[in-house]
Amino acid sequence: MKFFALFIQRPVATTLLTLAITLSGIIGFSLLPVSPLPQVDYPVIMVSASMPGADPETMASSVATPLERALGRIAGVNEMTSTSSLGSTRIILQFDLNRDINGAARDVQAALNAAQSLLPSGMPSRPTYRKMNPSDAPIMIMTLTSDTFSQGQLYDYASTKLAQKIAQTEGVSDVTVGGSSLPAVRVELNPSALFNQGVSLDAVRQAISAANVRRPQGSVDAAETHWQVQANDEIKTAEGYRPLIVHYNNGSPVRLQDVANVIDSVQDVRNAGMSAGQPAVLLVISREPGANIIATVDRIRAELPALRASIPASIQLNIAQDRSPTIRASLDEVERSLVIAVALVILVVFIFLRSGRATLIPAVAVPVSLIGTFAAMYLCGFSLNNLSLMALTIATGFVVDDAIVVLENISRHLEAGVKPMVAALRGVREVGFTVLSMSISLVAVFIPLLLMAGLPGRLFREFAVTLSVAIGISLVISLTLTPMMCAWLLRSHPKGQQQRIRGFGKVLLAIQQGYGRSLNWALSHTRWVMVVLLSTIALNVWLYISIPKTFFPEQDTGRMMGFIQADQSISFQSMQQKLKDFMQIVGADPAVDSVTGFTGGSRTNSGSMFISLKPLSERQETAQQVITRLRGKLAKEPGANLFLSSVQDIRVGGRHSNAAYQFTLLADDLAALREWEPKVRAALAKLPQLADVNSDQQDKGAEMALTYDRETMARLGIDVSEANALLNNAFGQRQISTIYQPLNQYKVVMEVAPEYTQDVSSLDKMFVINSNGQSIPLSYFAKWQPANAPLAVNHQGLSAASTISFNLPDGGSLSEATAAVERAMTELGVPSTVRGAFAGTAQVFQETLKSQLWLIMAAIATVYIVLGILYESYVHPLTILSTLPSAGVGALLALELFDAPFSLIALIGIMLLIGIVKKNAIMMVDFALDAQRNGNISAREAIFQASLLRFRPIIMTTLAALFGALPLVLSSGDGAELRQPLGITIVGGLVVSQLLTLYTTPVIYLYFDRLRNRFSKQPLMKLE
């Protein structure tokens, strides 16, 4: 009593305490960072190694395997995958969520150093690593276009000036430049002219290398002057190389221009990029794992004026894609929902109390509780994100409950004519324990969430802590500020009060009287009520088993990624045309705003596209509906497939794939894997629960296999190295010399002219000059025939691996898809030597699915323990928890009604319902117990009176919680698909629970009272 009186009798101190909480919250809000979701990125490090000319199998066995053995010993690695392609290996290390990425990077460097002695000596450089996840969508894409500069020049500016500066920005992990390559002098040889002049390809290479050298020439010290010696030993343009003498034929010089076309071009002509239908160079910007997207994008945008100033004015530097606008729009929508929720909750209070002064009290208590939470969020290192703001939106209904319970009880005494000061003291004392029980038991629901491991635990930790802090502050405000304001603002006017609430009061009184009659019937027919309660328990089980489930709601971020997978033998020219065709099809869709893409590099049968959709206000379809509409049009393009997927804020795993979900096949025998992968892929492609089924197994690349006749070669005086050099000089885009410039280094690239590189019959025109000076055609000592060759070799751990990727059809669920995949594997009879397992998001989904029921049971057990401690009873917590089955039925039925799968967001809604619906029972049980202890009445009469007495606050708190969640259900802007499942679950659970628990709780109370009387004759103890 003295505790409450302290705050009621000292209004200045209480007001200043409230102001301190509010000011600290305002300061915390101004300092909080902004992000789409809590920081849940797995620490991922990518290791790269290269050995030019090595085929994929050689890279896998001689480079990837030794590195994997060393890297696999690092503590905290939970997944290691590698891809080896022509001349390069890329290893992706995914660490535990709790592992610090900087510490992991140090361990990776130590492992690379230890493995160095096991690597081939022909590697031009040591393996390197980057702190980045290659499967993560870029945070920004910039394009360079120009009417006056060539693609090579644009690439030069992009890589030399722009990429370097952007990569230095805090939060940026990597800047990939695509769409072309660095400028170079290209020497395009004519084999026929070389043969006629008697000049070998290697002689041309040696002549060019000897003519372009950069060596120190020294200096001369005269008597009074120091002279630096500098010669014109470098040739920097194609014009300078053309007159170069490469050979003498019968005393006549053979110049390079006589046997080759020498042009200023690019290092690798097999690269192409496009944006808005025209050639472009792309800057694809990725962030470090854990870096804040909004803050990183803002830093890059701040550098834009300086970046544009560093390049010529005739080069246009534009932002083609930016992930931040939809994130900001989504957060704006959540903030709008929060404001609407606060307004609706206060409206509920006004409708019931019909007093401006009384309504002012929760109108102050609710914002103070929410604003004060921002201070704790800042101290905990949280951010303003969709989940934390959703927690505050839902908290609106919770924090007002405490104020409503206190305010309504004080108002009841005021209506009875009690003086305000006495009414405030008496009212808060009567419900103080009730409010404390409701708040502590609600916070207890989140204890299992806080202890939950893995990504779901990390994801919802901010949600749980934010909501718990808001409830804690609300508890303090309700027991201090609320009674103080009631004592000083409200007046005791019973007659006037009756007049003010006459209209609504008559309706509420009629409802209350009807409830009393129906409750009296229920207490007389307890068996029927118990049948209803047991039926809800059974219905919960059936609904949970049957409802479709998914990991996380499919988000519409307004961004899509497309991956082109063409025939493995496709030429670059055809692949470039496929890119143009696909971009034209996608760009023509009315929902698409812009499309950029590029192809080329070491894997010529693949390409990437980045698609930005129009804002939601300008399109009617979701991103998934756009993908479904485009899927039919894209399927008509022969020889290639474009797989589209919507960019998500959460993506698990480091492997690059063409779709959102992965199923990985593992085998120690590569031959067995290559035998069974096509069978499994074909079976999965037939499943209606899956879409866009594809594989990363690339073992059908076209290869022209040459067989040397070594005896003939020995007789002709030709060794294998000369033959290999011939092929490399002709078809390898061989970099034979370096041109040094102040800001960069450029290459002289040699190969045969394009008309020869695009025709297999050009092999007939190749020749070498032996030691006798004779021109020997390649066909004299070699035969060739078409064959298949792997374009890439994949590992997971130390096993050969092949990942089958898939998307979900529109309306499909991940639970149905994973179950269908498992059935297909069983029906196929895949041998034990080939193992299958889900990877990435699908793997985390399965792990989460196994723990969902345990999490719910743990939450219920925790609440039971807390209530048992508070009530010093084993029985009363069961009475209170009997409200849960009806809430579960309502939540699951609502999800079914809205055709929404059961996701992690819906799971959180179920957890919240455990905390919400028990409040009704707590208010009933508290007053019934007090009536039995002090009124010497029967259990039936006590629970009947308690139910009628607490009917108004029960309805008020339920409607407050319902209206607090309603804006989430009705939201339709950016990020609505993330908010709606939470709102649907809570509203559905509250509606059904409210209808049933008003009857089931009193009946359960009676049942347990009878059991207590049967097994114990001890009277109820009075707890002071």
UniProtKB/Swiss-Prot annotation:
Q: Which InterPro entries match?
A: AcrB_DN_DC_subdom, Acrflvin-R, Multidrug-R_MdtC
Q: Keyword Amino-acid biosynthesis: yes or no? A: no
TM regions (residue ranges): 12-32, 333-353, 360-380, 387-407, 435-455, 469-489, 528-548, 853-873, 875-895, 897-917, 953-973, 984-1004
What GO molecular function annotations does the UniProt record carry, in alphabetical order? xenobiotic transmembrane transporter activity
* One Pfam entry name: ACR_tran
Q: Report the locations given in the UniProt record.
A: Cell inner membrane
Q: Which GO terms describe its cellular component?
A: plasma membrane
Q: Which domain of life is it from?
A: Bacteria
Q: How does it sit in the membrane?
A: Multi-pass membrane protein
Going by the UniProt record, its keywords in alphabetical order are: Cell inner membrane, Cell membrane, Membrane, Transmembrane, Transmembrane helix, Transport
Q: Which NCBIfam families match?
A: PRK10614.1, RND_permease_2
**HAMAP family, per database record:** MdtC
> What's the family?
Belongs to the resistance-nodulation-cell division (RND) (TC 2.A.6) family. MdtC subfamily.
User: Partners and quaternary state?
Assistant: Part of a tripartite efflux system composed of MdtA, MdtB and MdtC. MdtC forms a heteromultimer with MdtB.
PANTHER family found in the cross-reference section: MULTIDRUG RESISTANCE PROTEIN MDTC, PTHR32063
> What is the name of this protein?
Multidrug resistance protein MdtC
What species is this protein from? Yersinia pseudotuberculosis serotype O:3 (strain YPIII)
Name the lineage: Bacteria, Pseudomonadati, Pseudomonadota, Gammaproteobacteria, Enterobacterales
